[in-house]
Regions:
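Generic enzyme active-site microenvironment
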Residues: 7, 116
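Conserved glycosyltransferase catalytic-site signature
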Residues: 10, 43, 99-100
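Conserved short hydrophobic patches within well-ordered secondary structure
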Residues: 101-102, 114
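PIN-domain endoribonuclease scaffold, especially VapC-family toxins
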Residues: 2-6, 17, 25-94, 104, ...
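ATP/adenylate-binding site constellation spanning eukaryotic-like Ser/Thr protein kinases
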Residues: 119
Length: 138
């Protein structure tokens, strides 16, 4: 049974499925040691990752996702005011909608760990109460 819940961001998926990515080997090793982690994400993250992947990487990513390694959360219209507030709060970082949605849902769901290559932004983003994200990889 998982002992930790963590968000999966775009960079981990790209690193896992793009063999030429500089973080590929590290991502594969991280995943091998992550059996006790319950992964969460958004379909927006998959969309972003697929933009950076070639045909083989997209195929591998989708086959892997079919096995159910990630729990996906939906964004609803009710989430939009909080996502807008997140975008405004971090406008100096120019966050995209995906990051803002992930940060917003992380606070709402109490999942504070993340696997990401985006060290700059996820070092700056804060959760309710001012806590930083716990980066589990890189």
């Amino acid at each position: 049974m998982p002992s930790t819940s963590a968000w999966v961001d775009t960079g981990l998926l790209v690193a896992l499925f793009a063999r030429d990515d500089p973080h590929h080997d590290s991502a594969v090793e991280f995943l091998k040691g992550a059996q006790r982690i319950e992964f969460h994400s958004l379909w927006l993250v998959v969309s972003e990752a697929s933009y950076f992947l070639g045909a083989e990487g997209k195929e591998g990513l989708l086959k892997w996702l079919e096995k159910g390694p990630i729990l996906f959360h939906e964004i609803t219209v009710a989430d939009l005011p909080d996502i807008r507030a997140t975008l405004k709060r971090y406008q100096n970082l120019s966050p995209d909608f995906t990051d803002a949605a992930l940060v917003t849902l992380a606070g709402a769901l109490g999942i504070h760990a993340i696997a990401t290559v985006d060290l700059r932004d996820f070092s700056a983003y804060r959760l309710p109460g001012g806590a930083a994200f716990e980066r589990l990889w890189l």
